[in-house]
Amino acid sequence: MIVGISGSPRRKATEFVLGEALKMLEERGFETKFFTVRGKKISPCQHCDYCLKHKECRIKDDMFELYEMLKDAKGIVMATPVYNGGVSAQIKAVMDRCRALVAADYDFFRGKVGMAIAVGGDRIGGQELAIQQILTFYILNGVIPVSGGSFGANIGATFWSRDTLEGVKEDEEGFRSLRKTVKRFAEMLEKMEGV
């Protein structure tokens, strides 16, 4: 099962692109689940170390819904809008709060496969920096990061929204990078299942 996580507090561009990625994966035979931060209460990590002692997060909010989804996930597709040249505060909170999962089980994420999507209002608005933040999260936690590879989707799927849903839908280069990244992500998942 693959969990798609939308890190946008708004409904349009990032959610749309993530939905398209999940459809592509479903067409390849994968089961997917969708999680959005929109409308959810996900507080930032307090780094209080409660999770180190008690093996769970002390902050009881909507993050527990995602914790449950991630338990069965073989793959993670994390999508973020670009805010100030990086990830959204909401997806950063999600990544930081996953500390509790690793505190409870150091190998929680080990062997899962991850890809990243970033949607920016400008063509060169920080998409690659946002993706690097997500890939760093993956690496630190034992998730196998997958990119689209050389020649056009180097570290993940990048979109230029022009701050509209219509802009995303018209971004042919963005969809090319998405198709390449989804293809390599699916191939890695298939290889991992065959191991």
UniProtKB/Swiss-Prot annotation:
It holds the Pfam family FMN_red. Its cofactor is FMN; [4Fe-4S] cluster. It comes from the Archaea. One of its GO terms (molecular function) is oxidoreductase activity. Redox-active protein probably involved in electron transport. PANTHER family: IRON-SULFUR FLAVOPROTEIN MJ0731, NAD(P)H-DEPENDENT FMN-CONTAINING OXIDOREDUCTASE YWQN-RELATED. This is Iron-sulfur flavoprotein AF_1519. The lineage of its organism: Archaea, Methanobacteriati, Methanobacteriota, Archaeoglobi, Archaeoglobales.
